[in-house]
Amino acid sequence: MKLNTSKVRRSILESLESRTLFNVDPIWIGGVYIEEDGGSDLHGDSLFIQFKGGAPDTKLTKLLINTDQGLPGFSQGDNLFDTIKGGRGADEAFAFQIVGEDGRFSSANVGVELSDGGMLLTLTFDNFRSTDRLKISVDVDEVQFLNDPNNIPLFNSDLDPITSGAEFARSKLTAYFSAPHFEDAIANTVYRNEYDQEFVGSGLTLPKDNDGGLRDRTAGTATSIVQIPKPISLSGTVYVDNNLNLIQETAEKGIPNVTLELFRLQNGNYVTTGHTTTTNLLGQYEFGVNLGLQPGTYQVRETQPNGYLSVGAVTGLLNGNELGKTVSGNRDILTDISIPLGDSHGTRLDFAEAQPVQIRGFVYSDLDDDGVRENGEIGIGGIEIQIVSIETISGTINQTIRTNSDGSYRFEGLPPGRYQVIQREQPVGYLDGKDSPGTINGQTRGNSTVNDQFTEIDLRGAEEGVDYNFGEILPASVSGHVYHDANDDGIFQSTEDGISNVIVRLESSNGVSEIRTDHLGRYRFEGLTPGSYRIIEVTPTGYLDGKDRVGIVSGSVVGMIDGNDAIRSIALNAGNSGVDYNFGELLPSSLSGHVYVDANGDCMRDPEEDPLGDVLIE
């Protein structure tokens, strides 16, 4: 049977996983601080920010610079941002500015949260991408000695307006990243006075420790993190596909409580993930994101549900594209399910199942030879019936059974497919009759162009073929006598002798048969199929043709005289015995006398009365 090949892809197992699909470069994030004043507080200080790498479309969404280096709150050695003259801070104050080295950063795409005298700078970004470099300017002062923070003049008196690289060191940088298909990532690092070694291998293009000879005025930091893909999911349905088209249609229900197991490709082999699931009442299953499945190449294996036969696995969809491959020779596996990106969800990874089919019928005595099994037509038991598959969804079928005592047979639990049913033997005492293809869902399917065989019986899931019947015929016979009808009354009587070795012929649409009467004048034609017959007798030598008589079939006179020595229109049904189709014959008679001269006129010939010769007698 032809499956819907538009939905089926045949393949072999892949040997290697393309790991390049699933790995991404790490994110490198770095920052550099430069004190821009050498002995007086005349300029804002510079902060550089840059990141590189990560997954495609990775963005830096938020950045925190925390200058609280000790216990929470102001401590000796902490730094603060001096943005408003007359507030908390030493000497001059310089408000936050976006310098934007790359020329595209501005207040329109950089959000700022910063309080004068605060120790936390928060920046948010709309579109900060890999290799972008941001420069900002803001005044940074150091708490050289800690005085009462609530007494601002006293507190400011021991602030250092010049914050060297060593003094900015131990400030903390926290960066937040987002990227499609990956979990949000957070990088934490600490500024160091000597930082060039931190940048090795990063690819970042930030100022070096001694850039411009400002080694004692710089601090920097760099670190790398690896993004974690968001978990993926795989889902599908196990459903009843009795029409075998590998498409779940509205009326095709899911199959609950079917077990599925998930495997992952590792080092060229599929190994179990340890995850199994069962279908719900609608036949649906899912290996969900709660399992934390990472991008990779997977395989789903179905445990064949009881009472069903596999139609096939159906490749799924990922973002509208075909997902996975079927396995030649195993319809319970979907393999090569390649999910290269996190937060991807493979769907419609389905398994189609069909219910078994059956076919039944009778071997029976077809009394009227019409090919239709009717009331009163008995079954014939013990006859060998064979079913052979032409094509099925599950292997080759070749089974043989015998009919029950009522003539019935039934083949059950068959895989859907195309079949032929064969009657292997002719019942003893019967002639072969008409075979009638049965029906499936009220429609005739199959044909009987070959005797005692039905073929091309196409059974879809859960279908039952009924009345695939083989008719048999009880043979008919016709008999009678050829006899000497002594009294010429056309009735054979026990005292009248039969005539042996007389030729009797039987004509029908099947041809002509010829026999001779036995020593009692009897003849009998046996093994006749239902039909209309004509009997012809050849008048035996030495006899004259007598009267012929139409015989009896089932108590009724059947046939008619057809001229001399023939009886026609003898209608015989299956099992009929026509009797007393008799042909009477006559022995010839003689007549003699004299022509003479009746001298005395007494009409009696006397011895002396002379004969007359040469007289014409008619």
Model-based region annotation:
Residues S46, P229-E249, T259, H345-R373, ...:
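A short, Gly/Thr-enriched small/hydrophobic beta-strand-prone motif that recurs across taxa
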Residues Q304-T347, E425-V466, T539-V579:
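Structured interaction patches on ligand/partner-binding surfaces of diverse proteins
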Residues D25-I228:
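Extracellular or exported targeting regions of proteins
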Residues T279-L291, F351, T403-F411, F470, ...:
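Glycine-centered loop-to-beta-strand initiation motif
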Residues M1-D25:
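Subset of Sec-pathway N-terminal targeting signals
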Residues N242-E249, G254, Q266-G288, L367-E374, ...:
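Short, acidic Ser/Thr/Gly-rich low-complexity loop/linker segments typical of extracellular
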Residues Q294-G307, G417-V428, G531-G542, L616:
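A short, solvent-exposed beta-strand micro-motif common in secreted/extracellular proteins
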Residues L134, G283-F287, T335, T347-L349, ...:
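Short strand-edge motifs at loop-to-beta-strand transitions and within beta-strands
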